[in-house]
């Protein structure tokens, strides 16, 4: 896979510095063992009260093309464009109620942690993973008959890195551009809001 290491202010582990969100996919299938590994990594994410509210719906083109196409159809047109070769889509969802029926205010936070574990494991396996909010949540909910207390949060495309030159010229430029983040001083405060860390 192409490398785009983060330009960090302090040295961090390669697994984090090296993870990025590619858009160039090949159509090569992802193995069942690789899929199980990324899902196992997600399974071991931390969660409030160990509630583990996350649920992942896997759409593997090589296993069930009909279901894959239904999930793909919920992506916004822009995301459909560059995801056309992607072999796997994974919907990230979460139970928003606790086992007692109370609102789980940490459900989305916990599901995000599980999703991050999933994409870090994907990176460790040399796979490309791209998390997206650009999909029709209501269409997904209806198409796949989700229970009322299950919230669709994101879609992750997963696969092997492909040929960047097959991307649209604008996306090709973005794919090759250095990664950027705001400065550490803008996100970390010490002892109070906006106080220097």
Predicted features by range, described:
Residues 1-197:
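Acidic, surface-exposed loops and disordered segments
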